[in-house]
Amino acid sequence: MPPKKAPAAPQASKKTEQKKKEKIIEDKTFGLKNKKGAKQQKFIKNVTHQVKSGQQNPRLVAQAEGDKKNKKDDKMKELQELNDLFKPVVVAQKVSKGADPKSVVCAFFKQGQCTKGDKCKFSHDLSLERKCEKRSVYVDGRDDELEKDTMENWDEKKLEEVVNKKHGEAEKIKAKTQIVCKFFLEAIENNKYGWFWVCPGGGDTCMYRHALPPGFVLKKEKVKEDKDEDISLEDLIEKERAALGPNVTRITLESFLQWKKRKRADRILKLEEEMEKRKEDFKSGKSLGVSGREVFEFRPELINDDDEEADDASYTFELEDSEAEEIDDVQDIDLSRYVLKDVDETGITVASCERFSSYVASTEKDENKLCVASGGVMENENQSEEEQEGDLENGFVDAVPVDENLFTGEDMDELEEELYTLDLEK
């Protein structure tokens, strides 16, 4: 590995260096400051200069300072020459007696050389010069205003005024026609019409009208009207309800059914009238708009005529057993048969609260299934003790005798599991 660099010695501060230089100057000029000789004073000056300038030759130092000063002077002269060449000469302004200096534009401000700012007695508004200057016969001041006056800032009245001014005289000379030029309408609709618009169809010699048709509405005006008329459904309903007034018929089920029945009858009557009208039109030879189904409804004899005019060749088509389908009579559903009515509660059964007790009785019967399956007597709470004793005296026993030694212990366990899992039907 390369040897590590020795740490840089800390640099002495400027004050420390200055003290060292003063110490050196005092040592070299010790005892000479109080002497008045020219040689001693010159020697002290040279020593002081050498120490402060870093032991440099005083001639070289003086020469470097002279060169630096000369370069600075040369730059100043060069800038002065450039300013004299390219900067226009500004003559001091004179204002006539009694005139307002603020009505005159500052000449230095026009050249970008005014350094007075707000303290300048002349005006710094460049528009004053254009307002006060004489009107030129070669420039029309209205051109700038017309260029800024575009169709975006016009309303419907302004548009009519511009059209009348621009095309009014030309429209009087043209042949009378009511057709509006399509280029004119496209320019207005696309917001391209203005003072300097020229018709692509021939300018002023276009044979069509360059005037707004009656009832014309601009797009932006139309959008505003649509926005104003656009109201919500809730507001519309409330508005219509308020317009009905207080003296109106209240809606009930009976009135609603009567209204619906009347509407259905009116609709059926209207359909019949339309069908009769179509039939009369068909008879008179006006078959336009008549469907094929209506043709056969109006003239059913056409069905038989079509069968007679058919080819003599007959085609048979038999379905296989797998493809054969049973065809049942199908009837169309007529929605007019269904009428809304109040629900009649007569004859409607309601579940009683006793259904819970019957459910408990059925569960008790299920518990007796185990006794019956094991050959025991079914428990009967309604049977009295006297009847049970009478059965024993007569020798009738309902239970089947079982030999307990017939089964071993394991067989009994399996039998008990089967009996518990066994579920018999009633």
UniProtKB/Swiss-Prot annotation:
Chain intervals with Basic and acidic residues compositional bias: 14-27, 65-74
Coiled coil ranges: 62-87, 257-283
Cellular component per GO, a single term: cytosol
Amino acid composition bias (Low complexity), ranges on this chain: 1-13
Organs and tissues of expression: Strongly expressed in ovary. Moderately expressed in brain, kidney, spleen, testis, intestine and colon.
Major location category of this protein: cytoplasm
Matches recorded under InterPro entries: ZC3H15/TMA46_C (IPR032378), Znf_CCCH (IPR000571), Znf_CCCH_sf (IPR036855)
Pfam families associated with the record: DFRP_C, zf-CCCH
Source species, domain of life: Eukaryota
Residue numbers spanned by region Disordered: 1-27, 51-74
Entries under PROSITE patterns matching the protein: ZF_C3H1
GO BP annotations listed: cytoplasmic translation
Keywords, comma-separated and alphabetical: Coiled coil, Cytoplasm, Metal-binding, Nucleus, Repeat, Zinc, Zinc-finger
GO MF annotations in UniProt: mRNA binding; zinc ion binding
Residue ranges of the region described as Required for interaction with DRG1: 237-261
ZnF start-end (C3H1-type): 100-127, 175-213
Physiological role: Protects drg1 from proteolytic degradation.
Family named by the database record: Belongs to the ZC3H15/TMA46 family.
Subunit relationships: Interacts with drg1.
Identification of the protein by name: Zinc finger CCCH domain-containing protein 15
Gene: zc3h15
